Every structure is written in C-alpha cells, then in structure tokens.
Amino acid sequence: MRKMKSMKVVLAALFGLSFSWNVCAQQSDIKDQGYVHKSSTSYEYPTDPAVLQKLDQWRDLKFGVLFHWGLYSVPGTFESWLLCSEEKFIPRRTKIFGDMPYDDFKKWYWGLSESFNPTKFAPEVWADIMKDAGMKYMIFTTKHHDGFCMFDTKETDFSIAKGPFKNNPLKDVTYQVFDAFRQKDFMIGAYFSKPDWHCNDYWSRDRATPTRNVNYDIKLNPDKWKRFQEYTANQINELMTRYGRVDLLWLDGGWVRAPKEDIKMDQIIDKAREYQPGLIAVDRTVPGRNENYQTPELTIPKRQLDHPWESCITLTNHWGWWKDAPYKSAAQVINILTEIVAKGGSLVLGVGPTPEGTIEEEGIQ
C-alpha cells in the first residue's frame, strides 16, 4: 500500500513538472507571436450522423501536423500578418523592415510570388517523417490571409501553380500533399483562410487597409461583396471536388462571420458535404453548427473538456519557417501531447517547411 501511494506521489510530481514546463513553453510562444486567437466559449454538437462518426474517428487519432507554407516562407517571417496595419502588428513589421513605407512593403510582399520556387519539395518525404513521428492526421494551408493559393485554383493567378514553379510536375502542391499523406493513411485536412487580403473584392485596392477586415462598406457595395462570397465558395468547392477525400475543412479568420462579414458559411458547408459526406467543419472561434471542434491556440485548457477540441501548438516559436528558430525537444512535445490527451484533446503540431520545400533536420529529430 505504501508503495502504491509512493508511486502516485511520484506520478503526480512528474505530471506537475510536465504541466509547469508546458505552461512556460506556451507563455514563450505567445510572447513571440504577440497575438493569438481566443477559443470559443460555447460548443454545439453536430447532428449529422456521418459528421458525428467522423468526429469520433478523429478524436481517436490524438496527434496531427499543421503545415504553414506560403509566401511568408520565402523570407522566413510572420505568416501574412505583416500585411496588417493594426497597431498590435506594426512592431512586427518595423522590427524586421524598419521604416519601409507600408505601400512599398505590400508591393514587396506580393512580389514574393515571383521568387517562390520550392524545387526540393518532396511530399512523400514529409509524409514519411510525420508518420514516423506517430502523427495520424494532417492539415495543410491551402491559402493563408495573404490570399496566395497553394493549389491550382481557377479563381486567381495568385498561386504557386502560376509562378516560377508552374512547369514543375508537382505544381499543384495541395494535391500532391493530400495524395502523399492519404497514401500513408492520414486523415486529410484543408486549412483555408476566409479573409483574402490580395482579393480586390475583400481588400479593395482603391482604399486604405487599416485593419484585417473588409475595407469597404458592404451595404453600399453589395455587388462587390457578392463577388467575394462567390469567390470564396468557388475556391472551397474546388478543394472539395478536385483533391480526393478531404476529412477536415479548417477555416481560419474568425472575424469573417455573420452579421458583419457574412459569406454564407452554412451554405458553403452544406455544399461541401454533398461532395465530402461527413466532412468535419472547423470554423474556428465561431461557435455554432460549423465549429465541430474547438482550437485553443498555443495553449492547453486548464481542465478536462467534454467536447471535442484540439490544441494547435508550434514546433518552433512560429507557425511558418524562420531561419535558426529554436525547436521544442522531443521530450517537450511528448509532455505537451501527454497533458493534452489526459485532458481529452488532440494536439496538432505546427511545422513550417523551408522555402525550398524541405523539413529541417532539427525538426525531424
């Protein structure tokens, strides 16, 4: 009996040490990011039996990977957020680019599409690495807020498939990633940004862009907004019809929601499920029928939760690739995963491939 009590004390101490370590890591990541999205405060279970079945399957997987790969990978910087002129994001830009005028910075950033040429991209290697790490599902950034598409969309030429990589047989990057991971029995997720800062029907080029939001009055420009609604729906339909089985639609940019920025998400999800029955929708930070699981960012809930949830936590201190970024150790990732699973959740680990298309050796170790 004494041995049993001693063992419980040791395990409790180890878990407490692990928890303390995880909290410190989370605080460091949040400080480096400067901003994280807050989780929803309520949850609504889906009613579609096919969705419930797939959600149960997903909850059993526990460990996945979230790739952030796009224009921001070329210089190795803060994803799309340097384009945002909100006060909280300006220090990020000035720290790296000094007093470069904002309009000049935007032109420079958009111009990265002419130099993004990941000639070492080998999706089957990515899949082998993540499978060896014990991961069971994968989410890939098909489009971040900057609007640059990592798939061969018909809606815009602002795409990996239209730049220097266009003659490469792997030019439809999303297709290649999905196919490689599907062959390794991964559940497949498509990250998709609802806001699109490159699209003239979201950030109109004849107006300033002082915030992350649409920069014109929707009520005064209904035709312009309708075009954006159709643009968004068409791109999601492309992903649902041309890329094989898709299990998750992971939607970012929670400020794009009814009533202020209504893109008719209910209709989009209903249509998507006609092509992908049982599709798990993750309209993150927007509680209701289209947020089938919650996504606390760079943090772990303090207590066990009864509903489905996933902590999205970076392997380094950034979502995308940064040169010489510090990696979490294998022991640290295991501790994070252990705490999350003990609380009933899943861990999706953020990994940023290099601009050449490789996973850094330190990240593999």
Placement of each model-derived feature along the sequence:
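Mature catalytic domains of secreted/periplasmic carbohydrate-active enzymes
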Residues: 26-365
